[in-house]
Amino acid sequence: PTPWSGGSASFGTNVSGITGPFIKYRNDDSYSGRTVVMYGEVYITTGTASGDKTLFTVSADSVPAMNYSPILCVRSISGTQSVHPCWVETSGAVVIQDYTAGAYYSLRGEWAGVP
């Protein structure tokens, strides 16, 4: 897949410190219908997550079983943004690694085009 096109976007005070091209992405799981904005390329990207304000860096060693370099994504749900490490599988599916209730889980979806 060649998803890296588009421009930049601002999320106000919820998420800061994020730069790079972006596209829109649609989940195909229990988060069906939510909008996800993807950032990054094959470069390391950093971002500040809303809530605990944890600053983290996504590197090739920090995300398991990936076929493409990991990126950072911002998931926007009802006006609240959260930042998660992500990567693209060879099938073109995007995997979002999320940490909720003390456990990691993955959300998979498909590209939905450039905004």
Residue ranges and their predicted role:
Residues 16-20, 43-57, 63-115:
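Extracellular jelly-roll beta-sandwich "head" domains, especially the C-terminal globular C1q domain
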Residues 1-52, 112:
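Extracellular receptor-binding modules and their adjoining Ser/Thr/Gly/Asp/Asn-rich linkers
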